[in-house]
């Protein structure tokens, strides 16, 4: 008689995905971030659901309802801060996950990679709309500034902005629709994650060497289930330390002031995980140019499979490319720092240089260095 997990129509899908899945024997801790992102998504949906039970999407009561959650709801403060800091953890893991993909050449799985980039856009949209919901000063002005960027689109721009706002400014209609989208998007993301995994399981996982590992596979369970659980444990320790000791460390103090359309905060800036893109946006003095640079800074990820010019898949055995990879990481950290600084000298110049360097490394230095390495290896 066949084992139920191998014969049951539903359980066998789980079995082929998480239990009997043949996995490379040498994947490192960099391959833990996929499962950590899955746990983060589950945690965000769960905490978000409980927050939605007490939140009211109305301009007059939104701010008060968040205060009510923190003060009066049983463990409301815990749920709220787990949700807010969970988003930060989500993005840390996302960036590590993408960085891993770039370093080890995982982008050669083009279907998996492209749906991953779309997932990144969906998560960024969800996080942006979630930041608007507490209806603090930074929520309101962040929403105003970012939605206003669409007015740079020729011809249809201004109409499009008013259509998204549901009026002539960010108001009640905007908040209500942002709540609706913020609620539904995580479920769409979950469906996209399933497609992401479907494409991944068509090819099997990549590994640090970048070589085919069909000759050396091990079952996912128990080897990688236990490894994932260890990763989840570390994640929960980090998250709960953040939530319990410094819950507002990554937030903006301005968001503890209720939204006021008549008073602009001195420095409008998004959450830390968008600062690199915000710095690129601000570095171009033209509105449309800035918006294009902003979109391209993320969309450029889709070019990685096309720009790959090395005969080797991974960067594991390519020291020059490794140097460039870490230059790119340092560059992104500089952009993140600049995004949080006021628009004044010398930050403007640093931001412009870092923005140019970002595109220069990806579009020119990385492919040309890969070609040079091929030559050095007489390939």
From Swiss-Prot:
Stated family: Belongs to the cytochrome b family.
Species of origin: Ctenomys talarum
Binding locations of heme b b566: 97, 196
InterPro entries: Cyt_b/b6_C, Cyt_b/b6_C_sf, Cyt_b/b6_N, Cytb/b6-like_sf, Cytochrome_b, Cytochrome_b_C_euk/bac, Cytochrome_b_N_euk/bac, Di-haem_cyt_TM
Protein name per its UniProtKB record: Cytochrome b
Function: Component of the ubiquinol-cytochrome c reductase complex (complex III or cytochrome b-c1 complex) that is part of the mitochondrial respiratory chain. The b-c1 complex mediates electron transfer from ubiquinol to cytochrome c. Contributes to the generation of a proton gradient across the mitochondrial membrane that is then used for ATP synthesis.
Membrane topology: Multi-pass membrane protein
Gene3D superfamilies: Cytochrome Bc1 Complex, Chain C
Record keywords: Electron transport, Heme, Iron, Membrane, Metal-binding, Mitochondrion, Mitochondrion inner membrane, Respiratory chain, Transmembrane, Transmembrane helix, Transport, Ubiquinone
Cofactor binding note of this UniProt entry: Binds 2 heme b groups non-covalently.
Lineage, opening ranks: Eukaryota, Metazoa, Chordata, Craniata, Vertebrata
Cellular component terms per the entry's GO annotation: mitochondrial inner membrane; respiratory chain complex III
Metal-binding as UniProt keyword: yes
